[in-house]
Amino acid sequence: MSLRSTTPLLRAVKRPFRVVATTAILGYGFPESSFRAAMAEGPVDLIAVDAGSIDPGPYYLATKSSFTALEHVVRDLRVMVQGYLEYQGPGPRPKLVVGSAGGCGTNNQVDILAAEVRRLLFNLGGRELSEAIPIATVTSELFTPAATLAHKQLVPLGPQPGGDTGRADLEPNANAVVVAQMGMEPIMAALEEVDIVLCGRAYDPAVFAAEPVRQG
């Protein structure tokens, strides 16, 4: 996918692009005082966090479930959304990006995350403000993985063997759950339109790199 930004470069006078990265994985927690101190240090262009990991194994992808407790995820989101809403500048509010919703990045986990963010916007900012702030969701689940991946070569990311996706064991399976790991481009496209972007399975650095690359 090629993407050419139509947004003018936002910083004619160069200054450091400032990112507040809250924690290693959404739901793992971070001190609210540290977050507030970081937000107060100067201009903030982006608040971002990744929520995914392959470390827990394939169970959570297969069951479309999260390996982090929802109450812990919502706690982290509350601090981030509140920081976004209360930002006093200079400049516009920062963008807010979350990658690999629920850890596995399936579409239902993106929907859960979006519902919680909308609820937080309403609770923290009221109906009028919450309705004025759109949220973009970028999904990554493949509903026809056999057709999408047919006769392509699988390249392993580690010591596992690769394979030819034309094999019979990759034929359509009603129980199969496959997500494609996105890079920067779909996140950049969403950031052209909105401040808050919630993603399915994403390459960890993409959630941090998309906005500075978009701005040039």
Report the location of each language-model feature:
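Metallocofactor- and cofactor-centric catalytic cores in central/energy metabolism, strongly enriched
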Residues: S2-L157, R167-Q181, P186, A190, ...
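Glycine-rich anion/phosphate-binding loop at the beta-strand->alpha-helix junction
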Residues: A180-G216
